[in-house]
Amino acid sequence: MDCTNLQFESILNLLKTDVSDNTFLTITAKIEIFSLAAESITADKILSFAKLLPIHNYHFNFIKNHMVFYILNYSTLGFAKRFSIAETLCRELKIFHRTFQSTSKLQNLNNAEVLYQFEKLIESIQVFKAELASPIGKLLRQETMIYDKPTEKSVKYVIIQQNLIKINNLIQDCESIKNCRLIAELIDELYQKVYRWFMQIFTYDDIIFPNDNFLDRLLKMDFCYTYYTASNQHLLSLFEQTIDNQIFIDPSPYFEINPVYSPELQFMSTFSLKIFSKNISAKNEDLYIYPLLKTNFSILTFLSLENIFFHHGFIYHILHRTNITPTEEKKLGKINGFLNTVIQQVLIKKNNLQITFPELLDKIYHLHRIGLNIETAQIFLQMLTTYKPATTNNKLQTFFTNFSIIIFSAYIFFLCIELFSPTFIFHNKKKLILEKQKSIILILGEQFSFIWKEVNEIVDLLFSSTVTETYFKFYSKGADDYEKDFLYKDLMEKWGELFFPLTYSMTTPQKYTDKHVSSTVLKNLCDTAYQSKMETAYESLLPYITHPEFKFIFITHYVRPSLSLITNLTFEEIKDNRRLLILIFACKLLMPSNYLLSHYLLLLHAFTLQIFKVDLGHFSIIHAITQKIFDNINSLTQTIFIPKTNFLVSLLLTAYTVHMQTYVNPWIQKTISENIALLKEYIDFTKKCSSTLATTCYLNLENFAVNMYFGKNKVGSTSLSAFYRTCSKLIEESKLFKDRLQEIKVSKTLFIEMLQNVVKNITKFKDLVSNQTLQNFIIIVERISSHANTTYQDVLNSIDECHFSNMQLIQSFKNIVYVIDVLNTKNIFNFSLASQLIEAKKLVKKQDTYNQLNVQDDFVTVLKSHLNNLFEKQKPTINIERRFMLEGIPDIKQIPFLDVFDERYRLIPQIEKYLHWYIAYSEAAQADLVEPLLLKLG
């Protein structure tokens, strides 16, 4: 029998040869664990099964008189053609109900009532599916609407609300059967269809506000077209029109006109291309160089505060600031106020009432309006996972905290809303999502512990759903104590927890043998059943379950050895081993009152069977389940059970391997690639600096050319203006490299912390750390961490050496640029030649000297190529002769470039005697200047 998909025909075949109570008990246990395939159920098969059921003992009478409920409660629709299968089953159940008489005191779970609700649900879903398939998208997005925009949006809103009200009414109409597995599957699929429908009708008009300015509107158009293309095709023309209508004289306030490489600028590179190409569908294929949208605080002049999440580069910029100016701090204070408003008004639930589906969908609108969906939340998550807080500024710290809470909450919200339904199916999925995200967030570092606490509370309250005691009283109305116990245990197994006790007294109908055996004999029987190769050997213990010591002996001699064997298997081995399955059957059959143990064993089996890719969330849940199993056993036996660790260790190592492959490895590959690219650039920059350091440069005063030599060999020539430009360029590159090289140090810190966090989190599992395999894994991770630290440090040491060498040249270049700037025409005009010469001379005199780089002959060719690529070649010029009193042209002396202030430039002694006539009042000067004018006038 296939335990994952029970066929009704196979069940009936087993009953052809044996219809004993024990056989029925085993079969019903398997049905309740694995469920029947709904497509295999017919009225005739149900009728045959019901007629064979014993009237008394166990819960057989309940099944017989509530067959419709039992079938819906323990059958599954599978994964294909679900609604069609449900319709067919409804018809078969109607036929069965007409042909089989039953008696029931349960007001809400009798065959007639359950069938009525099931029929009504099927009919409602048929109508609702037709409405969802209506062309609402086309209706509301026609190019020639007869409505104005506000009316159009209100019509759309009314249609959405009408449909959401219908689905709420639909669920209320099937309140008493919504916890049946088959019904829950139908509801779950319906809600997911509604969610997809809702997302397909999302448009730009839903998030635009009257006070949005030019940049706000373009960013929102880009958001809508990028993530909701099908419903926003009209933006292809609107985007272009919006740009054409903007008076765009000077783009510099918006854009970095000559951008240099920066991660924050790259976030908006595609968007910038779309603006300059006026094409919202443009793709960035690195074919063009164009200005990039600014990412610093100045962009807030054009970007509304509530739209900052649309600008990913700006968020990145804030996260990576370590200090801010007073003006920026004031702006950041307003941003923090906005973030706090988002947390309080959008994310936190206002009251204790269970949130409705329309309210959850409304939160999608609010998150979209500020630029958040699951894709953008992932982009921001990536920023946070590679971010290390390095600021003591309170406002920057507040921004990090609030931003993290919003992003993690929004991301998990979108993960949940995609799967949401008011059923136990979603409730269990939500627990898995939260555990998985908790594991991922906490491994990022201690700074996220408080953040996770807030996020967990927000999400848990948004999607809170459970079975209340009031609902259970309604659900079980008319049931006797035994039936209430059966229904309570069923809900417990589905929801995993019920927050109210079952307080009813139990008088369980029994039919047991009169056999009486000693405790020693019972121990031997349990040992024999455990060691037997027959899967159903445990059934031989059924006659002894009334023995006063049965529970203790059965757990000690059957359950504990079975768990020791199971926990000694690896995760892969346990999937192929049936021992866990046999243990579940045995516990459910022999200890029916201890439903918690059966429930946790069943959960353990479900997770090990259904999980194909283990992650930290799965491990966290399975680890918690195993601890509850062990705690339950310890509580029942008042002993301490110490399980084997192979199963959990293999699961943990698999989970961490997946975590590292999913999160750490891609980050390492991306970071190393970026670091290598950066190092290559810096090496090239260092080669340029080294080549220049190896030269002796002379200024030719005749044509203002700078001639460069390696020793006595001339290797190049460039104009003074080109030399000046190159000096300035290298100085700017040096500044940029100083900031960019910090990324390597940050990468080192982040990488080492990632590995250390892995070790730190593993060692938290005190019950597993003694396992040798786990110890070996920890040693390997620590070795990787040590090796990475050494490698990074070697690279950083090399960078420091290059930096020391490069800065000698850069400092000289700074002085050269300063001297040239001091002596430029503008400064001489403003401050006089004398003062500027004195200033330049002071600088030259205090210039420190350094040893010139000695170059071996075989390196000259190599260095020359770098030098030629660095400096523009001197263009041919007309030789300008100096005007001397002597005949002929004297030899032009080449003077070292840095030695421009030699004797020839020494100031003339008592220069004021020669200049006094124009810098001070003199009668002689006045007479010389005015006399010719007076003569002409006369």
Curated annotation (Swiss-Prot):
What UniProt keywords apply to this chain's record, in alphabetical order?
A: Host cytoplasm, Host Golgi apparatus, Host nucleus, Virion, Virion tegument
- Compartment(s): Virion tegument; Host cytoplasm; Host nucleus; Host Golgi apparatus, Host trans-Golgi network
What GO cellular-component annotations does this UniProt entry give?
host cell Golgi apparatus; host cell nucleus; viral tegument
Does the record bear Hydrolase in its keywords?
A: no
Q: Where is this region: Interaction with large tegument protein?
A: 457-938
Name the GO terms of the biological process aspect: virion assembly
Q: Which InterPro entries does this UniProt record tie to the protein?
A: Herpes_U30, HSV_ITP
What is the protein's quaternary organization? Answer: Interacts (via C-terminus) with the large tegument protein/LTP (via N-terminus).
Q: What does this protein do?
A: Plays an essential role in cytoplasmic secondary envelopment during viral egress. Interacts with the capsid via the large tegument protein/LTP and participates in its transport to the host trans-Golgi network (TGN) where secondary envelopment occurs. Modulates tegumentation and capsid accumulation at the viral assembly complex.
Q: Which family does it belong to?
A: Belongs to the herpesviridae inner tegument protein family.
Q: What is this protein called?
A: Inner tegument protein
Source taxonomy: Viruses, Duplodnaviria, Heunggongvirae, Peploviricota, Herviviricetes
